[in-house]
Amino acid sequence: MNICLLDESGAGDGALSVLAARWQLEHDDSAPMALVLTPQHLELRKRDEPKLGGIFVDFVSGAMAHRRKFGGGRGEAVAKAVGIKSGYLPDVVDATAGLGRDAFVLAALGCRVRMLERNPVVAALLDDGLRRGYADVEIGPWLRENLTLLHASSLSALTDITPQPDVVYLDPMYPHKQKSALVKKEMRVFQSLVGADEDADGLLQPARTLAKKRVVVKRPDYAPPLAGLTTPNAVNTKSHRFDIYAPLTR
């Protein structure tokens, strides 16, 4: 994949070259997107809109730490949707990991979550966030146990992941109507990089074949059901719904 690669870390240790080789990224000085290594983290920038700033994964501080400490915990909609109960913490495959927010919430509640991400740039951002999270004194011990990353296409990986998860979680990219600053910023940067998940409908059947207990699909409240398949089971919030599907027998 071609992207502008910039090293602003000041370290001069060749880390960016190693990263590019690992994720098979080719430097393109004319690319509209830049992957930038700063002294703090790896971040993604939209070069023609510098005011948007950089997108990066941070499990240790900021919004994710606040959600972990002060969010709804097991009362969060995503926790209810995957079926967390007293004494039951499902094993989850998040097949559309993105920036890992929902996966992190589930991991913080005690679920073991395997994240799938097919875009190499997004996978590199996730890997960088995990590396810093694993090294953190407070969250590192349980994060290493509960949250891992697999760089692979969900369409192919869902057919051969072992062991089978209890739950497959899907949150395909869908155009957002909301104009909140964060959504607007992230969606503009992300859609410039990966576009819409046009093959997302094809994920539902392999997800239902893989999952032992259920498949959960997060959708904006105005979006049609994935693959046009309605389900009577859902957890609803003000702006989203989590459609719940039974597994298919193999």
From Swiss-Prot:
<dbReference type="GO" id="GO:0005737">
    <property type="term" value="C:cytoplasm"/>
</dbReference>
<keyword id="KW-0963">Cytoplasm</keyword>
<keyword id="KW-0949">S-adenosyl-L-methionine</keyword>
<keyword id="KW-0808">Transferase</keyword>
<protein>
    <recommendedName>
        <fullName>Ribosomal RNA small subunit methyltransferase J</fullName>
        <ecNumber>2.1.1.242</ecNumber>
    </recommendedName>
</protein>
<feature type="binding site">
    <location>
        <begin position="153"/>
        <end position="154"/>
    </location>
    <ligand>
        <name>S-adenosyl-L-methionine</name>
    </ligand>
</feature>
<feature type="binding site">
    <location>
        <begin position="117"/>
        <end position="118"/>
    </location>
    <ligand>
        <name>S-adenosyl-L-methionine</name>
    </ligand>
</feature>
<dbReference type="Pfam" id="PF04445">
    <property type="entry name" value="SAM_MT"/>
</dbReference>
<feature type="binding site">
    <location>
        <begin position="101"/>
        <end position="102"/>
    </location>
    <ligand>
        <name>S-adenosyl-L-methionine</name>
    </ligand>
</feature>
<feature type="binding site">
    <location>
        <position position="171"/>
    </location>
    <ligand>
        <name>S-adenosyl-L-methionine</name>
    </ligand>
</feature>
<comment type="similarity">
    <text>Belongs to the methyltransferase superfamily. RsmJ family.</text>
</comment>
<comment type="function">
    <text>Specifically methylates the guanosine in position 1516 of 16S rRNA.</text>
</comment>
<dbReference type="InterPro" id="IPR029063">
    <property type="entry name" value="SAM-dependent_MTases_sf"/>
</dbReference>
<keyword id="KW-0489">Methyltransferase</keyword>
<dbReference type="GO" id="GO:0008990">
    <property type="term" value="F:rRNA (guanine-N2-)-methyltransferase activity"/>
</dbReference>
<keyword id="KW-0698">rRNA processing</keyword>
<dbReference type="InterPro" id="IPR007536">
    <property type="entry name" value="16SrRNA_methylTrfase_J"/>
</dbReference>
